[in-house]
Amino acid sequence: MVDLLRQAERLQPGLNEAIHAVVASGAFIQGPDVKMFAAELAAHEGVRHVIPCANGTDALQLAFMALGLKPGDEVIVPVFTYVATAEVIALLGLTPVLVDVDPETFLLQPEAVEAAVTPRTKAVVPVHLFGQCAPMEGLLRVAERFNLFVVEDAAQAIGATYTFSDGRTAQAGTMGHIGCTSFFPSKNLGCFGDGGALMTQDDALAALLQQMANHGQKVKYYHDTVGINSRLDTLQAAVLRVKLPHLNDFARRRQAVAAAYDAAFAAVPGVRIPVRAAESTHVFHQYTLLLDGVDRAAFQAELQSRGIPTMVYYPVPLHLQKAYARPDYPVGTFPVAEYLAQNVVSLPIHTEMEADEIQYIINTLHQILTQLPLA
């Protein structure tokens, strides 16, 4: 699905230099690269504060810890998302309230959030799924009306830009109270292991997040609040500093692959190309087709037999996962998510794809779709 080796080879001189410098310094934890990366990412994203942490899941957990929510408080999340979005909410004793997504963009919609608000609702988590922003203007309006915190899950959309109706623009993860992102190796900005970060415009929240990510201490061995151990290590920060200047180019390369796929598949029976959200750019962390009348398992098997991997994000929506099952969430509760889970499939997309590779995938997919019967 992605070729991390080829990207690393292209950036190898800078990566080698950065890694060797960290090894020579011996500053593997809280070394200078961590602060420098935070400052550089903040400048790139146009946000006051970036707080690096160990991974994207920790970023979400730290966000809810810092907001001071109490057990039993409700947090609205889309039912069609990666499990981490709801996982941290449940771990903290909060109640994830699931809502269905838009059938076109697969994103959380303001109307669905408003319908799910109760007196116990304290926050909402817009997920910028697959590389484009949720409709933040409407979601922020609903959040303001009901006095809700907004925690953006931008793990898949770093570098995506949202345009408000007045012409203002903002980066994914910078519009709510806190934005969370991941630097998992396959992400658009990925390190050589696990990594994550929080973003906020709020000075007080930034200070608290920084403290909570380091065992709740501002001064070593003096713990003012309960925290966790969630630090981005120096080696990963150094790698990310090398990659960050290429982030916009990474997006353009992915967009070029997506454009080729779009042109090839837009009029093909049995598949629907990704629908772009009107207010957001799309950085294509995933290129996800929606199959219509095509046997997905057979489709994937045929592609795999020809050397083309595919993935399903996500095969089981949250309400049908054992860990999040509830009596009031039976099969059929969220029909859009259930349909998507049965019919989406993602094609290879990454920064190092060559024209002949893209064309091979296009030609092969065309051949398979002419052979597979449509329901």
Name these PLM-found stretches.
Residues 88-89, 142, 171, 188, ...:
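Hydrophobic/aromatic ligand-binding patch that stacks against planar heteroaromatic rings
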Residues 5, 34-40, 44-48, 111, ...:
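PLP-dependent aminotransferase class I/II
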Residues 25-74, 88-92, 98-100, 165:
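Phosphate-binding glycine-rich loop
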Residues 10, 72, 254:
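Pyridoxal 5′-phosphate
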Residues 65-161:
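PLP-dependent aminotransferase-like
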Residues 152-190, 220-224:
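Conserved active-site segment immediately N-terminal to the catalytic lysine
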Residues 174-210, 217, 237:
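Active-site PLP attachment segment
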Residues 1-27, 32, 306, 348:
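N-terminal "arm"/small-domain region of PLP-dependent enzymes with the aminotransferase-like
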